[in-house]
Amino acid sequence: MSDTPAIRLKRGEGHAFKAGGPWIYDNEIAEILGEPADGGIVRIEDYNGYPLGVGFLNRASTIAVRLLSRDAGAVIDRDFLERRVRAAWQYRKDTVDTSSCRVIFGESDFLPGLVVDKFADVLVVESLALGIDRLKSTILSLLVDLLKEDGIFVRGIYERSDAKVRLKEGMERVKGFLSDPFDPVVEIVENGVRYQVDVAEGQKTGFFLDQKYNRLAIQPLARGGRVLDCFTHTGAFALNAAKGGAAEVLGVDASELGVAQATQNAALNGMSDRVRFACRDVFELLPELERKGEKFDLVILDPPAFTKSRASVKKAVTGYREINLRGIKLVKNGGYLATCSCSHFMTPELFTKTIGEAARDARRRLRQVEYRTQSPDHPVLWGADQSLYLKFYIFQVVDDA
């Protein structure tokens, strides 16, 4: 153990890490002992040299060390990785429909910086940290073998490590096949709805699996009603509304590609007669609908992250307040609003406050139906605040009697 390179924390630093956090920042480190390579394994020590665990080192990143184990004597070998992968897959089998799901969710599965999504018989991988990038091939090989034990034969693997955050790790953005080439448009079924998922060109890994059960939750609220789905992407919420029995659904998105894919998905499900999509800027369309006196039984707001840093939170609050204000005004008395934020920096408390301000400005009352977060295959690891990012509310909009 003494031969392992180490980092030693400054006196008084590492509070978040000691409280369960998975990261150590560069400004918390007093010294580096030995000659570890970036992407290599280091022992983590407090100021007095007491061992706290082992993790990946990357001097090029603000996140200098990513935790692998709080056992400072852990050997990071194939057996270690197999235990991690097996535990992650078993957890999914315990908690979610695994036909399509997130199999590995980075720090929450103690494989920092790695995301693996399963779409039917295709795996999509996103590697966001230097250390895990070097173990990616081994982990994927282990996962393929593990799935085979359950009778699941992986047809292909596609890499979507094209996020800008890789540049902060000193890594290039990459995407492409990690297996023999295959048709990257994959059909999946979720909540009884069929989708064509483009794992090569779709947003992120191709489809937002984190909203799986939130989409299911709106189905009964849509029955027989008129539904507006804002920021529809490839139509998932809109199609779940139709699955729930909505009489009429309008899905809106500024992306022509997204609207085209949503339209195809509606046809795939035989819903084209009840679901239509429009390529429009939601911020422009909602005031237009209000001026026309349009009302809906259910309004769904699923915007992209308005902030990806603390510096832009104030601007994001303005955006969330505006979109919720406009959305609330379009809900019939007694109708429902489903609204969410996928930004970690928009805390639950701040998001709740912002919705409340929007309701006040709209002069409407909100009755909370339920509060939800991301689906269980995106587990929230307590102590790792960044693992909680999706906030999802359903409200009934009621006027004073």
PLM features: residue spans?
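Non-catalytic accessory regions of SAM-dependent methyltransferases
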Residues: 1-120
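Non-catalytic substrate-recognition/targeting regions of SAM-dependent transferases
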Residues: 104-117, 136-208, 216
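Conserved class I S-adenosyl-L-methionine
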Residues: 224-233
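Conserved SAM-binding loop of SAM-dependent methyltransferases across substrates and taxa
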Residues: 234-247
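Conserved SAM-binding motif I beta-strand of class I
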Residues: 248-253
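S-adenosyl-L-methionine
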Residues: 257-300
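Mobile active-site "lid"/loop adjacent to the S-adenosyl-L-methionine
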Residues: 296-326
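C-terminal catalytic and target-recognition region of SAM-dependent MTase-like enzymes
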Residues: 322, 336-401
